[in-house]
Structures are given as C-alpha cells and as structure tokens.
C-alpha cells in the first residue's frame, strides 16, 4: 500500500491528482468546447480593425472642378464638419464629380455614423444646385480599401450598353444585397442613353438655339400624375403617351415650325442609342468590358462576404444571355485562405517540433505523451474563448497560437521534470506527483502571471495598432492561462498514472547515449559556472554591455511600420500630361496594358479611363494587375513591380505608379504609391507656391522612390469673358450663356426615360467632330430679348488659361498629397526623416501645415509609443513578480535577463536585413516574458534551498543552476522551435510572420547562453546588497 504525503502536500493540484475521472472529464469538456468553437470562428486575414468610413459621391456632369468645389463639396463639408465622432474629412472635387470621404473614431458604430451622414446630406440639400441629376449618394466603404472581388463582364455579340444594363439590374443589385458588401461599382460607364448631337450649322441656319431644342425635349418627355375619373358606377385611371422610349421617337419629335412646316429633331441633330457618358471606358486584359468591383463594409468579414457572392454567382449568370461572359479576375480571399493555411501548417509543424524536443530530452514515450496532450489541449481550448470574444482565425491569432506552442509546453515540462526527479529518487508515482506538483506550483503561477503581465501593455495600445494586436495578445494570454491550468491539473494526474520508476529507468541505446551527452554538458556548464562566479564583476560588465548594445542597436536599426505583403494583386495609376484627351489616354492605356500582360508573372489585368467617383482626372488611368499564385511565379511582388515599371518606362508621355495591395488599409484616399505626406494651406495659391519646390527636393532624396503629387494645376481651360454691358443690352443673362455652353459641351442630362426596371437619360451635346477645339465656341448661338439670334463671340472673348484638374480638401482646407515609396535599401523611418529634413530646409510660412497620412502617420505614432510600450511591459512584470515574491530585489534579478534578449533579437533582425517594425517589436515584448523564466526557475530553487536546507547563497544558486539546467534548456529550445517555422516561413503571408520568428529565435539563442551565467552572478550581488542594507538599517528592517 502506498503511503501518501500529508493532506496539505500537492497544493492546488492535489484535488485533481486524487480525482482522475473528474479531471479527465473536465479536460474533455475543454477539448469539446474548443472544437465546437473552432467550427464557429470566422476566417480573415487580420483582425477587423477598420475605421468606420463612409464615402459620399455627387455627380454633376459637365461642371468644372471649381464649380464642383464651391457648389457641391463646400456645402456638404460644412454640414459634415458638425458631426460628432468625425476623425477626418477629405474631399476631391474634379470635373463632374465630388467625392467626400468621412472617417470616424474607432469607438463610433458604423450605423450611428450612417445616420449622422444622412442627416447632414438632408440639411445640405437646399444649398446644392437645383439641376443636379441625382442627389448625393453615400456608401459604407473605405475608397482606399481594395476590392475583395473583381469581375469582368464581356460580350462579343451584344453592345456594351446593353451588357451594363443587364449587369446593373440583374447582377450588381443582388450582390449589393449580400451582407458585408459596402459598394458595387461598375467601371466602364456604359449605361444606356439616348444621345442627341446637335448640328450647330443646321440650328443656326434655321434660326434656332440649343436652348430651344432642350426646352422642346424636356416638354415632350414627361411622366407625371394625371388623375382618374370617378363616376357613379366605375373609376377610370387616366394615362397618355407622354413618354418617349426610343431614339426613333425623339428623332421624329417636332421642335419648331417655320413657314408652317415642322422642324423635327432629326433635321438638326443625330439621335442614337448610346452610352450616358462617352468619356468612360474599362478593359479586361485588352477586351472592352464592364468591370465590377466589390468592396466590403468596414468591419465586415471578407471571407464570409466573398463566399456569399461565390454561392450567388452561378444563379445570377444563368439569367444573362450565353454570349455574355462573367469572369472572376481577382478574389482577395484566395490569398487570405492560402496565408491562413500556411500559418496553420506552421502551427502543426511547431507542435511536432516541440514534441520532438520533449522526447529528445525525456527519452521516454509515456513522459512525452503527457506534454504532447497538454499542448494541443491548451491551444484547442483557446478557440472556445476566442468565439466568446468575437475573435477570428487570422494570421495574428494563428501566430499567437504558434508562439504559444513553445510557451504552453514549458509549464508541462517543468512539472514533469520535477515529478520525474522524485520518481527516480525512489518515490512512488502518486506521492511523487503530489510532492512534485506542490513544490513547483508557485513557479508555474509565477511563470504564467509574469508572462501575461508582459502582454498587458499591448491591450492599452492606442488607435488602430492597438486594436490590431489586441486579438494577438488576448489569444496568447488565454492559451498561456489554459496551459497553466492543464499543467497544474491534468499533467500531474497523468504523471501519477503513466510514469513509474521502471518506465523512467527503461533505456535503449539512444537513451543511454543522450543521457551521457547531457551529463557531460551539465558537467561542462558546472565548471564554467564556477569560474564565472569567481569573477562576478567581469560577468556584470558583460551584462551591462548587453544593455548598452541593446540601446545602440535600437537607435540605429532601420525601422518600419508593417511588413509589405505579397497578396498577388498590384494597384496601379497611369499618369499622362494634364491636357490629354480621353481618346489619347485610352490609347496610351492600351499600349501599357499590352506590355504588362507580357510579363510572365501577370495573370490578368483590368484598367479604367475616365472621370467618375473613383478616378479624379481624365489624365489618370486605374489599373489592377492580378499576379499568378505565388507557387506559379518565380518572383515576389516587389520584384515584379520593378520589372513592370522598367518595361513601361519606354512608353512616351506616361508614368506608371504601382503598389501591392495590403490586408491592412489605414488610408482613406487612393494614392499612387504606398505612403502619403500632405501639405495643407488656407488657399490654393499658397499650395501652388510651395508644392513644386518641396516636390523637387523630395524627388532628389535617395531614401524616397516614385515621388509624385496630386497637385495638377496645368489643365487647359477656356475662360469665356462676357461683356456684361453688351449682353444686358441684348437681354442676354449669364444664365443664358451658361445654359448654352452646358447644352453644347456638358453631356447634359436633360430628360429621363422611365421603364419598369430602370431609368435612362437623354443626353444633349453639340457635335464637335467638324469643329474641334476652341473653334466649336464660334457655333454657340443665344436668343436676344427681341427673339434675334446672337453669336456668343459677339458678346464674349475667349482666353486660354491653366486650371487645376481637381481640388482636394482635408478638413475643409485645400490640401495636396505627396505620395512616395521606399526603396529596398532604405527603411520607412529613414524616408520619414528625409521628408522632415526637406521640410525644415524650406522654412514654410505658418499658414502651411504638413502631416503624414495613413501608414506613415501610424508609423510615427507607433514609433513614439514603442519605447513606452517596452517600459510598460517591464514595469508590469516587475510589479507582478514583486507581489509574488514579496520582494523588491528578486524581480530586479529576474529582469536582468532582458537586455540579452533585446541584443539577440535586434542582431538577428539586422543580420537578416529585416526592419524593426511593429511585428518585430511584439516579438521583443514576448521575449521579455520568455527569457525571464530561466531566472525564475533558478531563483525559486535557490530560495527554497536557502530556506529549507540552510544552504549559503552561492551554493544554493549553484545547485539550482545545475538542477534546473535541463528543464531550462528544454523549455528554451521548445520556445525556439515554436518560433522557428515562423522564421523559415516562405508561403503566402510570410512577410508578416517572418519578423516575429527572426526576433524570437535570435533573442532566445543569445539569452539562453548568457542568462545561464549572468543570472546567478546578479543574484549573488543583490544578495550581498540586501545583507549590507540589513546591517546598515536594522531598525527599519525590523519594523518592515
């Protein structure tokens, strides 16, 4: 019969050791909860941390940027500026379109923001032009967020106007109804319309004006209430043929009579079915297409949204004619799924490596099975808590679980090693489990809570970076906490049932060889440790030098914000001279497209030319380049971008700007390159003075690449200067002049054709093919007060001037954005420093305000808080350790291990050519929590030896180091191998995972070597200091 230790032996583990059935069932419950939770967890690339963002688009065809700014954007901005919770408001006013982007505070629900935006639009309605074709339309979408899915609709048999009509009514509306979809845009602008092209000479010969034609059309095509007849027996609804539906109907329309003969519209104009806007076009590869871009709502799960669209597509395409082909050209979820799969594989690999290292040290199958059960149980149990907290399976949470693999096994290893030690001394398994678990319980609690304490500052990081890493920190903390519970319950219970003196003594050739090897290693370590303890000041000097080296490396290592990911999609902007026409721009775009499609890494391409809510100017073309899957191409995205830019450099008159799409989108504007810097002023004149010199200086900086500005003030404008006195004498008002010009050159939407499914427009313009350019103004005719026809040139002169192609505002003030990339041999930190130096050298006046935007602004914010984040982690850990040890001194001894981890991590990043970005900083903070466990295990046993066996401090710490050498080495290697798959990652999303693995592997390798020697030395030095203080202040010590 086994003699059990006293009832108090075993600590918190005693109940679970003595009740194996209850313990087993409790663990099964945790396992089942985790498995069920996993099935309900959504999948995404990163935690959902989007700012609530709403875009408001107002179209005013034919209006110049100045008119759009003053008549539409400014009234809207004044109302939007009064909304509570608004973080930033930016706007872009271009020819015919106003786009206002509203970014709200993270804490404001998107639905609340939507209500405020709608109220502001309603308040501004009376201030907007009365002839707006449509009121402002808002969408819950961030315009800078790349589409989650891009579809191309093509047909070789049906006109594109009919294709767009079918897509808009049958496909786009249904996709818009999918939960999570924020906006569906149809690039290509081929909405059906009846186009009326006036023949200026024919109208003039008949003594008519364009205003006469416009009035006749609007009066002839109406759709209004007519009432009903209600008689004694029945009611009759009234209707009439007041609607004209086809181009032929309009062609036969009588617009005037002369000498008793009718003048029909077809006599003075060509009337045909066409597109509502003839200056828009989209292409899929090199085929004319309607390109459908689907963007998600901020905060919506991208995987769920894309899956819903995929399920719906077959049914939607069945409703289209067979000649209409719908092709999915890009789906961001493909790379997201691949990235998550790669991370899941690395997680499984980490578990396998950790179990392998356990067997290598324990050399016993039953002893290996125990932590082999504890690791997956701790990780799977975490899924249940993640569901409760509304987390998702994403790259960061999977990275947390991968790193946790090395953490969670530590507790089980420490418990097993301690229980095995007593069994090898001859204790019975049950007694050894009670005694070993009770002895190690405080160490497990210290390890767990001190490690969780390191993660606490991550929960208080501000802004979007804090939200981003909250899931990472909480997931890791939960896994560590569950691991501690498992290690104090299931692990000792399994040790009591599965381990025995015979099983531990049973050895094969490998076991005997490895045992001899470890004994020799421990003996060598013991000899070196004795020498180190005899030279404490030299060792202390080494420890202090690591602290100094950490500070030096921290200052000089290149710094970045977030790794640039290879998601297989490149966003591009093609820039041409500011006065380029639509036809010329379309031709240049086709030349560039043919070059891009020849690249072996490119799978498909979509491009768009024209001005609408997504493209600000006619001299810009938008491109989306879809690359082949990573395993089907030889080069990463940055290499492909460099190659494409070099190839396009040979095309005259264009500049191509490219940037890879990212899962993390902080910007609210679509810029040409990755990072933005803004200049804001009180007037456009101030910007025109200071933008060119700053731009030229930045373009000369080697730390910057692809520097460009959205400041475009060299667009050609015809300024019509009316002699108001002459016009007034003839009875011609400025409204008459504006109407005549708008009728001729504005693609004016003058009437609406209503059908059961949709509404179509009648577009009025002047045929300028015979008289292109400024000569077309000679054909403009006005009606005087006496009914005479007056040429515009009789009362006005025309001057050619330059004008901005668009007017941009930031928080209601004029702004220009300078975009830039960072060359491969420089970091974002160096680029930011170069921009700030260039700014200081120019000595801007006080009315010029500068600011980084988007990722570069977040980088500045994160860089400023990084040092405080590390300090907060150290302070939090000191407080927890001080409370646990009831000592001011011992926590300092434990924390003395931290500089070695910092040196190792920073050196590894520097040697690997990686930047110190937020991912790497998280790794360093985790190292703070990991490396101190070596000191905790040493100090716990040294203090116990001093207290219970009366050993002197030197002998106690020496024996503790030798006794704990094997579990220290085992746990460190387990943590290192847990991070190794991340460091060696090569698949999709590897850019995100690799910095974390590099920093942790480097830090663990160096700290493992140094802390085995520096910790005992510092322990003895602080012990001497403590004794000195006790002798110096005995009364205070007694009172304490």
Curated annotation (Swiss-Prot):
Looking up InterPro entries in the UniProt record yields: AcrB_DN_DC_subdom, Acrflvin-R, Multidrug-R_MdtB
Q: Which superkingdom, per the lineage?
A: Bacteria
List cellular component terms (GO).
plasma membrane
* Recorded topology in the membrane: Multi-pass membrane protein
**Sample GO molecular function, one term:** xenobiotic transmembrane transporter activity
Tell me which UniProt keywords the record has, alphabetically.
Cell inner membrane, Cell membrane, Membrane, Transmembrane, Transmembrane helix, Transport
Q: Where are the transmembrane segments?
A: 16-36, 342-362, 369-389, 396-416, 440-460, 472-492, 537-557, 863-883, 888-908, 911-931, 968-988, 998-1018
Q: Where in the cell is it found?
A: Cell inner membrane
Q: How does it assemble?
A: Part of a tripartite efflux system composed of MdtA, MdtB and MdtC. MdtB forms a heteromultimer with MdtC.
Entry similarity comment: Belongs to the resistance-nodulation-cell division (RND) (TC 2.A.6) family. MdtB subfamily.
Q: What is this protein called?
A: Multidrug resistance protein MdtB
